[in-house]
Amino acid sequence: MSQNFDTEFVNTKMWDLFRKRFKSRTTEASYQSDIREFCRLSGKPFEETDSRDVKRYYETMKKRADAGEISGITLTKKFRELHSFASFLMEQESGEEAPGHDYFYPYLRNMVKESP
């Protein structure tokens, strides 16, 4: 797995800082896949997306979940990963957490949760 992320989707400096949190390449690959998918569907780099892009992505993924193409848990995982990356970017920009600017977080509150 490449250490670098596609420059068309994310700032590679930020990605390199973020990926240091991962304990495995599998985790890194999962985050890359979900971020790429979101960016491809939005047609924008991650840092240029807004609440409308997140809403469209949610609606698209929810339709896939309702059709049985992905599970509710998978949808939750995708949003948890996207939320994590968005939150990280906000922390880097402001020096503190700024969850009010994370467009993914509000969707997580109503998503399927994994069983303990």
Please place each PLM-identified region on the residue numbering.
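N-terminal core-binding DNA-recognition domain of tyrosine recombinases/integrases
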Residues: 13-116
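Short alpha-helical hairpin
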Residues: 1-15
